[in-house]
Structures are given as C-alpha cells and as structure tokens.
Amino acid sequence: MSKEERPGREEILECQVMWEPDSKKNTQMDRFRAAVGAACGLALESYDDLYHWSVESYSDFWAEFWKFSGIVFSRVYDEVVDTSKGIADVPEWFKGSRLNYAENLLRHKENDRVALYIAREGKEEIVKVTFEELRQEVALFAAAMRKMGVKKGDRVVGYLPNSEHAVEAMLAAASIGAIWSSTSPDFGVNGVLDRFSQIQPKLIFSVEAVVYNGKEHNHMEKLQQVVKGLPDLKKVVVIPYVSSRENIDLSKIPNSVFLDDFLATGTSEQAPQLEFEQLPFSHPLFIMFSSGTTGAPKCMVHSAGGTLIQHLKEHLLHGNMTSSDILLCYTTVGWMMWNWMVSLLATGAAMVLYDGSPLVPTPNVLWDLVDRIGITVLVTGAKWLSVLEEKAMKPVETHSLQMLHTILSTGSPLKAQSYEYVYRCIKSSILLGSISGGTDIISCFMGHNFSLPVYKGEIQARNLGMAVEAWNEEGKAVWGESGELVCTKPIPCQPTHFWNDENGNKYRKAYFSKFPGIWAHGDYCRINPKTGGIVMLGRSDGTLNPNGVRFGSSEIYNIVESFEEVEDSLCVPQYNKYREERVILFLKMASGHAFQPDLVKRIRDAIRMGLSARHVPSLILETKGIPYTLNGKKVEVAVKQIIAGKAVEQGGAFSNPETLDLYRDIPELQGF
C-alpha cells in the first residue's frame, strides 16, 4: 500500500498519549478491515493501511462499505462512481440504485426497543419513544402530508426545538421524497427568512413557545412574521409545546392548524401504513445553510444516499456504534450535527433529544442525564467543555458516568488543555474524540477512531474515503506545517448542487476557486507526520499572514485563553492600502479583572515563547464582547470586514449581533 511522501518537519513535538485502544476488543473497524482484506486479497495490517487503500481505491472502498453497512435498497447500483471524474465534476454515486433514507432509519424490527429519549429543560420526566411508536408517528405525519398534496421534491421545513416532532416530521418528509430543511427557535425572523425564502417551502412545522435558560420565550409573533414572508406556504402546523392548545391563538396565522388536527386529516378507520418512495441515491434529502455571517446563506443540497452512507460509515466504523448505544448530541435542529445525530437510528442505537440550556438549572444537567439514562456517547461543543473547566466542575467526583465510553467535541478546535481537563476531571477511560468537517459535507473529514491512540491536542486521524491533505499556497502537500485543508478525490457526501445556482457558479466559487479541481474547505490545519493526527488552526479566510508568516487564529487563542484574566479573545488581520497586514488581538476580560499593560506584556511574552516573535500581534486591545454564530462559533470574518470599513450583511446568523458595533471606528485602528 503506497503512502504519501511526507517531506517536511519531522521534529514534531512528541505528543502525549491520553488514551489507547483495547487490543483485545474486536471493533467494527477491525471487522471491516478483515472483510476488505479477504474480499480484495489485501494485507491490511493497520488503520493506516486501510485508510490509504480507501482513498486510492475509493470506488472499491465505498462498494465494500455498501455491503458491510447492510443498507436497505430495492434496486442495486449499476456503477459506484465514474472514477474518470474529479471532485469538482460532482460525479453521480451508486447510479441506478433505489432506496429511501427514512426506511433505513426505521428498519429495526425490535419494536419495543427505545429509539428516542426526550428530555427538556424544566421537566423532570424523560419521555421514551420506541422504534414501533416512532414508525407509527412517522406514518401519521406522512399520511397527512400526502393528503395535503406534499410530493417528491417539495420542501417541508421545521422552525422547531430539538424534539421528537422534528424527527418525525423530517422522516415523514423523507419517506415521501420531499426535501427537509430546518432552523431552531433561537433564529430571528430575518435569519429564518434569509434561509427559507430561498427554497419556497410548501409546509412549515413550528411551536408556540420554548423554554431556555429558565425563561419561557413566546414564539408566535416571530412565526407570524415568518409565515408572512413565505408566500408559497400551503399549511402552517403549530405544535403546542409549552402551553395547551386552549391557550394558543392561531387566528393571526393564515392556513394554520394544530398538530393533532393536521394528523387527523391523514387517518381513516385504519391506522395509516408507512410507505417509502424508492428514489435514486442522488435524490435530494436535506437543504442545509451556510452560516450567513457575511451575506445571504448558501443553500447546499445533500443527497439521501450520500448522507446515509457517509453517516453510517462514521457511526459504525469510526464510532463503533451498536444497537446497545445511547447517544446524546447537544445540538439544535439548525446545526448539521442534528442531521448527523438522527442518522444514528440506522444503526439501531437510541438517541437523547435534549432541548434547553446545558447550564440550567446547574452545569451538571447533561451529566445528570448521562447517569439517569445510561448514555454511552456524549457529543458537545468544545466551548462547553471550556466553560465546565472554568467553573471547576469535576463530574468524576459527582457522577458515576458508568456507561459513558465516548465524548466527542465539535464546533471549534478542542484546546490541548481541554484534553487534560476531560481525562483528569471527567473520566480517564473514555475515548475523547475531536471531530471536524462541516455543513458543506454534512459530516466529518476527520475524527474519532477506536483503532488509534488519542494524542493531546490532536484529532485522531483522517476518516476513511476522505482524501484530505494540507496544502501550501503553491498547491503542494505539506506535513508538519500549516496548510489549507483540501480534499482531492470525490466523496458521496459533497453537495449535489446549491439551490438556485443553475450554472453552478456559486458552488465552484465556494470550493474550487483556490485550487482548480480540488476542494478547498476553508479551514487551516496541520497534519502530524509522526502520529497522523490533525490540529485545526481556524478558518483559512481568517488566516493571519503578517510579514509572510501564515498561521491560524486558534494558535493564538490556545495561548491567550490560558490566562485566567481573559474570558475570551478574537484575533483578526487588518490591512492598509498597500495590502500590508498586521494582527489585532481583542481581549474580553474575565469578571473582576481589569485590562492592564502588565497583562498585555505577559501575553506578548507568552506568544513569543510559545510560537515565535513573528506571531506576536501588533496591537492588543480590550473589547466588551466577542461575536458568535448561533452555533457557537467565533465570527472573525465579519469583524475583519468591519475594521476594514466594509458593510456586513448579518443574515440573522449571530447570537449576539450587537457586539459587531463594538468594532466600528476604533481610534487605535485608524491611520494604519
């Protein structure tokens, strides 16, 4: 098996091993590696061998995984993929096959096994939904949708919390061949309309109110304005979520109906039966949206087959998930992690739908659920782990966490110190996996792996079938050095197209304008040639390059945020008219600490010692707020545009849009 040539820095720091795989445990990855070796006559001794085969012979890899995964289909494929086409050609996958995404998620016949656990802030009760009950509910939703005229290709949307209703509505839409899209109640009216108005939905599901952070938030006024901005809607289904229907007034929302009445329209004397439209592998399943922090969100169309087979690969092989697992992913329906989570049902595992704050009534709320339910896998944001560390929480002392074997972190790079915190203060025997990908591929390029050690500060490995490299500006792969994250070969989970992008120009500009024919993901990373692990260095559109030294903002954050005086930070470039660049670091001070010259000096010294003199920011300034997206990601690009004097279209994508004004007309930034 040929391997990449890896010229470059071999003097990578020896990484600290935090976890090692159990050599006695026969994982699904091990079984797949053995099956491939037997079927293809290959000696695949390690994950590294399997990975390199999977990207060099990617057509064979996906064919073998199709068999291994047990995908349910009504017609087998004629061809896996045309290997003469590159990733920029967006080749069709598994041509000729017919299947249904929802059928694959609802195929498990142990009817009394729990599929969903529903937990909500402020409610003690945990509601259980079995696979049989889920099938019955999806059948009701689908029958009512068909009755009102929803058909293949129509758009059905949810403006919903993370609840069973969102899962049921999505699976019903998928069973028909309609296209699902969703946003969460924390989106404002503009943010919702920026997204949904582009795709002209026929049907919307929503709720009358939600509870978050100890408060009830009425949703009806926002819903009313959203409906007004969506002229193609034929029906608005309102789900009583906090109040009973007697206390909800629908009179101001045209074509509105309560959920019970909507479901009743599809029933007759006999309960409706589930029907699954048999559709091409490439049939659209989801429309996902980019963050919209610098303009109108892009509408990415993801196929049913591509999403299914990619998610199965991640859950079965990389996550070693089985039907005995229970996963809690702290997410909203407006984030791709929700879609990723729901696909877990295809493995027969159960998932916990939690709606509410992860810090109310106490920061232990998720750990309480882990113990009460017996959760085996917890998926959360890197930021939440940092918050727990700041609050000195020690679940290892307060909770048993007996069944928990995996914690996955996503949303932003996981800091090296967070690895130490998790293994010291949460559980020493778990696999801590940092996973990274994006909405663009509705999945991961790299992530967790039960076949490999966990090294402090590194994502374990590139995922099977994902031909990922770090490239320099000249388009050459670099090892042990910072580079642009690229994918060089076709993958079934890339968008089939963008909605309303007939000539494909937006699609090409988004991924293929930097390196022709090669997917540039917009992230900056470094691949360790010794361990194969990856360090994410931030968005490449936020890459810093003062005096010809390229580095990612997270390299600065990792140092700065170890200072107890600093609550948060933001690092962006500023350019003058000659396109010369300097680095500006903004600090948000922790409560009880003042911005002082001594702190600035200590931070400069720490960056100089930890990185180099050329990494030291030109200016370090105080700010009262750091802008974040609704999904908890720092917004560097919009701030970069503001300090350059450019207008920023907010796109309703910010959790705290008022903070953007803090970066306008800063005196210290004038005259550069």
Curated annotation (Swiss-Prot):
It is found in: Cytoplasm, Cytosol. GO terms for biological process: fatty acid metabolic process; ketone body biosynthetic process; positive regulation of insulin secretion. Highly expressed in kidney, heart and brain, but low in liver. GO terms for cellular component: cytosol. Its EC number is 6.2.1.16. Gene3D superfamilies: 3.30.300.30, N-terminal domain of ligase-like. PROSITE patterns: AMP_BINDING (PS00455). Keywords: ATP-binding, Cytoplasm, Fatty acid metabolism, Ligase, Lipid metabolism, Nucleotide-binding. Converts acetoacetate to acetoacetyl-CoA in the cytosol. Ketone body-utilizing enzyme, responsible for the synthesis of cholesterol and fatty acids. This is Acetoacetyl-CoA synthetase. It comes from Homo sapiens.
